[in-house]
């Protein structure tokens, strides 16, 4: 067993990232291996582990582990409204997500700590002629913790296939904000780029720290099988944003009152809110 294989076996989220798409029905047609380099090989099995802890005057990035092509360098404190908030930018040394990539991220916010995690720029899922790319994300937010995970948009190129699975484990007193933004593609690059990807599959689940399920949502987009321009799907819009807020009820009600539902087809703006406690 190689050193990389041993490290993968010893890291549950990396094991899941390698296995995620194997039995997924939506990816059954895309199990062939790339001719250039096999899936999950060195440089194609990325991993990030970030652990945030509370100190006297601020929270810190107390532990970090990284495997190419995933990279984090250090936490910065640039939020003037929350000066004790460590802000971390995730970087891809490959520039984009490629066929055969297997990516995993573990973020742990300890009791009373806070963190903001984002990306360096929009994430591009490159054109593919074999296999697919997969991603596992695990977030743990302990008692009184606060996590913002606000990634930049994901842009799937034509003929790309991407599957992502996110699990948020959270204490009832903690708060987590998670967002994902999906673009229609490089619509000004080529006529076939707008909704030209093969598969986009996303699953997001939340649970308490004891493992009790709070919610699960999954959607699979296959624009070459069924048009996404239909009414009730994307219609004429080119960006889909999904923001999930998990917070104690006293915060939830106050925030919800300030975020009304909104639909403006001429202005290209549609905002729907789903209330749950």
From Swiss-Prot:
Quaternary assembly: UreD, UreF and UreG form a complex that acts as a GTP-hydrolysis-dependent molecular chaperone, activating the urease apoprotein by helping to assemble the nickel containing metallocenter of UreC. The UreE protein probably delivers the nickel.
Disulfide bond positions: none
Native species: Yersinia pestis (strain Pestoides F)
GO molecular-function term, one example from the UniProt record: nickel cation binding
Keyword Nuclease: no
Gene: ureD
Family: Belongs to the UreD family.
Top-level taxon of the source organism: Bacteria
Subcellular location: Cytoplasm
Main function: Required for maturation of urease via the functional incorporation of the urease nickel metallocenter.
HAMAP family in UniProt: UreD
GO cellular component, one term: cytoplasm
UniProt keyword terms in alphabetical order: Chaperone, Cytoplasm, Nickel insertion
A Pfam family annotated for this UniProt entry: UreD
Protein name, entry field: Urease accessory protein UreD
């Amino acid at each position: 067993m190689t050193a990389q294989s041993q490290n993968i076996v010893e890291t549950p989220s990396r094991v899941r990232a390698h296995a995620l798409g194997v039995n997924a029905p939506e990816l059954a047609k895309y199990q062939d291996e790339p001719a250039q380099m096999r899936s999950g090989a060195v440089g194609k099995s990325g991993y990030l582990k970030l652990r945030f802890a509370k100190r006297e005057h601020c929270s810190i990035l107390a532990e970090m582990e990284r495997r190419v092509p995933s990279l984090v360098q250090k936490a910065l404190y640039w939020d003037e409204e929350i000066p004790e908030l460590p802000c971390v930018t995730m970087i891809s040394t490959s520039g984009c997500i490629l066929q055969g990539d297997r990516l995993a991220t573990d973020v742990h916010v300890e009791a009373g700590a806070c963190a903001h995690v984002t990306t360096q720029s929009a994430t591009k899922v490159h054109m593919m002629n074999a296999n697919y790319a997969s991603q596992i994300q695990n977030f743990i937010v302990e008692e009184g913790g606060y996590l913002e995970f606000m990634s930049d948009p994901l842009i799937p190129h034509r003929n790309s296939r991407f599957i992502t699975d996110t699990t948020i484990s959270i204490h009832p007193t903690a708060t987590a904000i998670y967002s994902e933004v999906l673009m229609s593609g490089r619509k000004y690059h080529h006529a076939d780029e707008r909704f030209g990807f093969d598969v986009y599959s996303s699953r997001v689940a939340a649970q308490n720290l004891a493992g009790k399920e709070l919610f699960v949502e999954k959607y699979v987009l296959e624009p070459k099988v069924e048009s996404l321009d239909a009414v009730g799907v994307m219609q004429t819009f080119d960006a889909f944003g999904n923001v999930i807020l998990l917070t104690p009820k006293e915060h939830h009600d106050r925030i919800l009152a300030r975020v009304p539902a909104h639909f403006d087809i001429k202005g290209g703006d549609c905002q729907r809110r789903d209330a749950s406690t």
